[in-house]
């Protein structure tokens, strides 16, 4: 630290006496002073390229290295959150708003609610929704490791087991949702299930650890919006990250739904997408339930955590299971305490 202090003081003192620096700054100011010509459209590209060339020549003349800000690739702008939505709008020539709601693991449910609200309010007939996560970045994995919520033994992370932690994954999920009557009028047929209700709320309690009150309130809100009684829910897909939060979430589900509701979880199969996980999991639920089946968690009885083992019969553990009923539900709980709950049912013939 002391060396850095002395170095900065040395440079600050001598830079005032550098005639070359003053000459460099005068020439740089002249380069940057050039504005766009009278015809903006035809001039702007030429001016940008001319300035870039002049700066490179100026640096070479004075032996000056490239400035740090000139070493940054402009393609970094594609990391702005709404860029995937913008790209889809360009590919599909979609002129509606392109936004990127940020709700961590509850991101897909949040985007779904925004789309349904827009459709029900008459602001849209169709919406393209989705989430995308990059491949796991060392900073993301490292922060999860430091928070003690990532699996560290090299084995597949399974919900409801030893609470060893989750594992981070990347990918994307995109849906097209819309007014059913309108799309049927265009000759389209629906996939999956009909969305009856979506609710989102916040625990307002802890960044990582979920509460009981927040998710339970979210479930009740979704049931009310969907006009569905808990007894009607044939299956419930859980967030279940293979962390101690699984126990809290299981208690939440058992406090609302009857023992006949079949419980599933998907992160052992898909991994834990930071925003997209809800999309993957909801897609799996919809595509299976629409065919009358539930895909298993892939759990043997002796793998289930001892404290949860007495509730193991409620889990779809290791075999494909046929299911009766018409209503399915899904829960996601995101970092920051944000919850999203989706209630769906089979389409009417």
Language-model segments: which ranges?
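Acyl-CoA/ACP chain-elongation machinery
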Residues: 123-147, 151-164, 198-212, 238-247, ...
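Glycine-/small-residue-rich "gating" segment that lines the acyl/pantetheine channel
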Residues: 113, 117, 134-185, 317-323
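Stable alpha-helical structural segments in soluble proteins, enriched in small hydrophobic residues
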Residues: 111, 218-229, 256, 281, ...
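Flexible, low-complexity linker/loop segments at domain and module junctions
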Residues: 191, 226, 230-232, 311-349
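Condensing-enzyme catalytic core mediating Claisen C-C bond formation in acyl metabolism
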Residues: 154-228, 232-235, 348-349
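Conserved catalytic cysteine-centered active-site region
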Residues: 1-114, 143-168, 251-280
